[in-house]
């Protein structure tokens, strides 16, 4: 299935049906009085997060969603039928953004979460509603309220606990394949990964989700390479794993390139907890590993893990470090949502 994480959608709620002007006409009843029914309500447009979807590709082939209008009222106090609602089924993690591309209307992060995008118009009143002590036979009724036209953007941000960052060919997909059941495309050329991949990782009886996004290059924030369009998919992550190719002769420059792109992207991404790992040590001798690790630790100001995705060396240590950050972040969220007790 093709991956699509941004699309424009046009929606319209249904208008309300008009009220009915009608009078009761029966044999032997001279003054039957008004009996016009109300119009039906128009259908509303909703969005709902559902399980089993991980792309917005369906909205490429259908961008217009118009709910049906309510039926007009009828005589004998019969109310018109209401229009059916329309529900846009989107993946969990979808942001709904207004036409200005800035205002976030809703962020659907849980299965079953719903948001009303356009309310259907109310049905008009029939003439029965206007009967009074001074007007026994009203000949007026209300038209239904019109529906609402709206243009919105749907933007998918994958929900993962940890995000993989690095230059192209840093070994991100190999790491994901070695630590999870995910099977991303792996090859020895840049930009093998063209779309984000998710993998469920297990460590010490715990599970969490890792997102692998296409590699960044210098100038990605300005649109070079695949650009920074996929960085949105790691915005929700609790921790970032920065993989650096240990066989590169410019290992410190490679590290700083990614950090520079994170800072250029803006938001809180550059402030997220980061774990740095030097990959591909299976292709290095012990002296190279020691020298380049030392240089990288000097640049990062912290610990640098040494791993090999191909040989499986050092992977569990990195996974445990990731889990420690994720577990801490989950604990903080529980405290934030805990009800206050005296």
Curated annotation (Swiss-Prot):
Protein keywords: Cytoplasm, GTP-binding, Hydrolase, Magnesium, Metal-binding, Nucleotide-binding
Primary localisation category: cytoplasm
Positions annotated to bind GTP: 166-173, 191-195, 212-215, 279-282, 308-310
Any one Gene Ontology BP term: ribosome biogenesis
Binding site for Mg(2+): 173, 193
Span of domain Obg: 1-159
EC number: 3.6.5.-
Cofactor requirement: Mg(2+)
GO molecular function: GTP binding; GTPase activity; magnesium ion binding
CDD domains in the cross-refs: Obg
Subcellular location: Cytoplasm
Pfam families membership: GTP1_OBG, MMR_HSR1
Keyword Magnesium: yes
UniProt keyword Metal-binding present: yes
Role according to the record: An essential GTPase which binds GTP, GDP and possibly (p)ppGpp with moderate affinity, with high nucleotide exchange rates and a fairly low GTP hydrolysis rate. Plays a role in control of the cell cycle, stress response, ribosome biogenesis and in those bacteria that undergo differentiation, in morphogenesis control.
Subunit structure: Monomer.
Family listed: Belongs to the TRAFAC class OBG-HflX-like GTPase superfamily. OBG GTPase family.
Name of the protein described by the UniProt record: GTPase Obg
Organism listed in the record: Cereibacter sphaeroides (strain ATCC 17023 / DSM 158 / JCM 6121 / CCUG 31486 / LMG 2827 / NBRC 12203 / NCIMB 8253 / ATH 2.4.1.) (Rhodobacter sphaeroides)
Name of the gene encoding the protein in the UniProt record: obg
């Amino acid at each position: 299935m093709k991956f699509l994480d941004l699309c424009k959608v046009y929606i319209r709620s249904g208008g309300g049906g008009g009220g009915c002007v009608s009078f009761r006409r029966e044999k032997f009843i001279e003054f039957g009085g008004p009996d016009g029914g109300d119009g039906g309500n128009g259908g509303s447009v909703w969005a709902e997060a559902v399980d089993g979807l991980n792309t917005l590709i369906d909205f490429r082939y259908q961008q217009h969603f118009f709910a049906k209008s309510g039926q007009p009222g009828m005589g004998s106090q019969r109310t018109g039928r209401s229009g059916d609602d329309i529900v846009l089924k989107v993946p969990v993690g979808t942001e709904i953004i207004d036409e200005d591309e800035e205002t976030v209307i809703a962020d659907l992060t849980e299965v079953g979460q719903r948001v009303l995008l356009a309310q259907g118009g109310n049905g008009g009143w029939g003439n029965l509603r206007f009967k009074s002590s001074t007007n026994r036979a009203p000949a007026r009724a209300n038209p239904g309220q019109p529906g609402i036209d709206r243009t919105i953007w749907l933007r998918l941000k994958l929900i993962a606990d940890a995000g993989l960052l690095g230059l192209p060919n840093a070994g991100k997909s190999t790491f994901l394949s070695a630590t999870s059941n995910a099977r991303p495309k792996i090859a020895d050329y840049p930009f093998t990964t063209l779309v984000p991949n998710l993998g469920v990782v297990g460590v010490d009886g715990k599970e969490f989700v890792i997102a692998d996004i296409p590699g960044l290059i210098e100038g990605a924030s300005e649109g070079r390479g695949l650009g920074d369009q996929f960085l949105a998919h790691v915005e929700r992550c609790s921790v970032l794993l920065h993989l650096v190719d240990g066989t590169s002769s410019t290992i410190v420059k490679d590290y700083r390139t990614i950090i520079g792109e994170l800072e250029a992207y803006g938001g809180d991404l550059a402030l997220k907890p980061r774990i740095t790992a030097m990959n591909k040590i299976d292709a290095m001798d012990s002296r190279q590993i020691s020298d380049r690790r030392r240089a990288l630790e000097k640049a990062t100001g912290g610990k640098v893990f040494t791993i090999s995705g191909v040989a499986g060396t050092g992977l569990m240590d990195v996974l445990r470090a990731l889990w420690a950050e994720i577990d801490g972040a989950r604990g903080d969220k529980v405290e934030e949502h805990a009800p206050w007790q005296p």
